[in-house]
Amino acid sequence: MNLIAILEQEEIGRALGEKTIPEFAPGDTVIVSVNVVEGTRKRVQAYEGVVIAKRNRGLNSSFIVRKISSGEGVERTFQTYSPLLASIVVKRRGDVRRAKLYYLRDRSGKSARIKEKLVAKKDRAAPEA
């Protein structure tokens, strides 16, 4: 492993600290808790939506979450290892066959729905143990 890759891994470890980032993929519905600073106050804001893209680039990894807010589509890009992210919770697994779901931008209503991924019984028992 070259020196830059080693430094990047150390920086990722430092950025994560105590946090753990769950496995998620495009099509999954996630709740991203973001630390927001307003003047002197610091609060946590929850942003819930569908992951439409994930970019794996080591320390520069990011993902885009899309949600419908009062009838208007809103997309937000998050840096995976940002110190502003408080937590990421996977609410629902989506069953999609694409890595980038940009086609959802053109769709609304029922055509923008994503099928839920069903987990086999033997796979379901393993994570609980």
UniProtKB/Swiss-Prot annotation:
Keyword Ribosomal protein: yes
Organism: Paraburkholderia phytofirmans (strain DSM 17436 / LMG 22146 / PsJN)
Membrane-spanning segments: none
Role noted for this protein: This protein is located at the 30S-50S ribosomal subunit interface and may play a role in the structure and function of the aminoacyl-tRNA binding site.
GO molecular function terms listed in the Swiss-Prot or TrEMBL record: structural constituent of ribosome
Keywords: Ribonucleoprotein, Ribosomal protein
A GO-annotated cellular component: cytosolic large ribosomal subunit
Keyword Ribonucleoprotein set for record: yes
Family: Belongs to the bacterial ribosomal protein bL19 family.
Name of the protein: Large ribosomal subunit protein bL19
Biological processes annotated in GO: translation
Gene3D superfamilies to which the protein is assigned, alphabetical: 2.30.30.790
Pfam families: Ribosomal_L19
